[in-house]
């Protein structure tokens, strides 16, 4: 098993990506600790893991609340001897598709503050334990907006580019202590549209051009080298690999899972 007996904390554990990653982590032998704001979504994710024989615990924790995150991570570390993997899969619905003249400061800052604050808070909480124990893996999730240009992307672009820069800098800081940091950059995830905030967000963007959401998503797929969008299980499987010892020389990297929308 890739993650046998690893202690993995997943913030945003009730969301589409967090729950999918948790399922794979548990299958690969990790003891999974899901944290998020929605108890029903956390319970649903945990139920699926338990049905497959996996080990999982849940906690209602707002990743914007540094004290709450610290208390939860510290409690997990005390009870289980440390933190091996920390994944931030927290998501924020936000405005895309509008020109800067039509975008309010609040709408611009919402994803920037949300993603950068929660990743700082969760990484800091985990790093404290990982550096003390001499190893661990911190996983972050970006978007193609970090590399794209064009109308309607300023908030998304700022948060994604900022998160990728944060991840690289953190990898440099924590590397001497044996801690790896890997950022994963997927594209729009087709099978997450029906279960996450992205469905409504993509619908709003499509509506700006009077395009049905399904057609808009098909257009996104057509702009990739593989002529398709990535899927949740592909991202989850990669996250498990990146968290495992098989990727022990990988750090400071942004893994491109855009199906070829971005060519690095």
Where are these regions (language model features)?
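Conserved mid-core segment of classical short-chain dehydrogenase/reductases
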Residues: 70, 91-109, 132, 152-155, ...
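Short C-terminal tail/terminal secondary-structure segment
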Residues: 97, 228, 240, 251-264
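Short, small/polar-rich loop/turn modules that mediate ligand/substrate recognition or access, typified
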Residues: 175, 180, 250-252
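A glycine/serine/threonine-rich, flexible loop-to-helix segment
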Residues: 176, 189-223
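Catalytic loop of short-chain dehydrogenase/reductase
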Residues: 92-93, 139-162, 167-176, 185-193
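Catalytic Tyr-X3-Lys loop
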Residues: 101-121, 135, 139, 163
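Conserved glycine-rich cofactor-binding loop
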Residues: 7, 14-16
